[in-house]
């Protein structure tokens, strides 16, 4: 599990390689990642936008920006948590991701909530020549 804390708000990430959605012979590798955001602060916050930096095994980066997560812009109250799962494809068998969420407080103050750098690793895949 990967963890980052910003302003008493914790972001936990659990990546998982999905062999059933991957085709190594076609250079297609797929991971799911589960995110838990825990508001340990005194104020409610709303997740407005996301920004991801995805790096493949060759060091090539792709940036993804968008509104909310999985179609939602959740409000997370003090002591509450929000969880979701999404996925990412790569053309290499490993890589990593990091990023941030733009959060807004009840007073309208915007700040970036850090998403920890996490690794995308697939198990060793042995190739057989026939």
Swiss-Prot record:
Residues 3-127 form the ApaG domain. One of its GO terms (biological process) is error-free translesion synthesis. Coiled coil: none annotated. PANTHER family: F-BOX ONLY PROTEIN 3, POLYMERASE DELTA-INTERACTING PROTEIN 2. This is Protein ApaG. It comes from Afipia carboxidovorans (strain ATCC 49405 / DSM 1227 / KCTC 32145 / OM5) (Oligotropha carboxidovorans). The gene is apaG.
């Amino acid at each position: 599990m990967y963890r980052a804390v910003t302003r008493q708000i914790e972001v936990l990430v659990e990546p998982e390689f999905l062999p059933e959605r991957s085709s190594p012979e076609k250079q297609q590798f797929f991971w799911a990642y589960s995110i838990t955001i825990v508001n340990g602060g005194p104020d409610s916050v709303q997740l407005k936008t996301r920004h991801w930096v995805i790096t493949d095994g060759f060091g090539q980066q792709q940036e993804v920006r968008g509104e909310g997560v999985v179609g939602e812009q959740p409000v997370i109250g003090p002591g509450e948590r929000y969880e979701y799962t999404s996925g990412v494809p790569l053309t290499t068998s490993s890589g990593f991701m990091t990023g941030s969420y733009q959060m807004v407080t009840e007073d309208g103050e915007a700040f970036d909530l850090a998403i920890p750098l996490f690794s995308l690793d697939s198990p060793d895949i042995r190739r057989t020549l026939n």
